[in-house]
């Protein structure tokens, strides 16, 4: 995921550099209408809603609609998306105990996870509670396991090169805890994951935001989640 402010700055710079020497006129034809429809949905944004921090980011592909609800609730529906991540939680993150519940129905690749970032070092982390057709741990390096909250989580690390982050395009490490028995509600004791990661030399930095997120990648689906 990437910060919304960085995207706005990048888009402004791209627009300035790409301005044509001579003005062009285009008609709003069927092709333009089709392209607009493919990119329909909720724009990227962050902020506070009903006492919870929310973050929603999309690469603009496909159709994804994110809606904040009462309290810690949100819903998201997506169809043929590129990539998006959205949810509600806190800013800054911490080793808190999180309770959540709801529904998560991906058709294809998607994750339901506690998701957050730290800086110094720049770390993107996931505690995955459920996923669709792709186990995100399969692309990483297995580091160990942690037993907590009635289940076993496999721990992985991965490196993202020149990828979007909360600090712009950077190379950074991802930390993953992936639950072996999927669920869509319960308690997540973040202190247990952070301590397990630390014992494996996987250190975190200064916490940025931390949300219970739904992520979709080249897929369709729906989710309705409440954070307590």
UniProtKB/Swiss-Prot annotation:
The active site is at 124 (nucleophile), 215 (proton donor). It comes from Aspergillus fumigatus (strain ATCC MYA-4609 / CBS 101355 / FGSC A1100 / Af293). It comes from the Eukaryota. It catalyses: Endohydrolysis of (1->4)-beta-D-xylosidic linkages in xylans. GO terms for cellular component: extracellular region. It is found in: Secreted. One of its GO terms (molecular function) is endo-1,4-beta-xylanase activity. Residues 40-228 form the GH11 domain. Glycans are attached at residue 29. This is Endo-1,4-beta-xylanase xynf11a. Its EC number is 3.2.1.8. It is an enzyme of class 3 (hydrolase). Pfam families: Glyco_hydro_11. The lineage of its organism: Eukaryota, Fungi, Dikarya, Ascomycota, Pezizomycotina. Residues 1-18 form the signal peptide. Keywords: Carbohydrate metabolism, Glycoprotein, Glycosidase, Hydrolase, Polysaccharide degradation, Secreted, Signal, Xylan degradation.
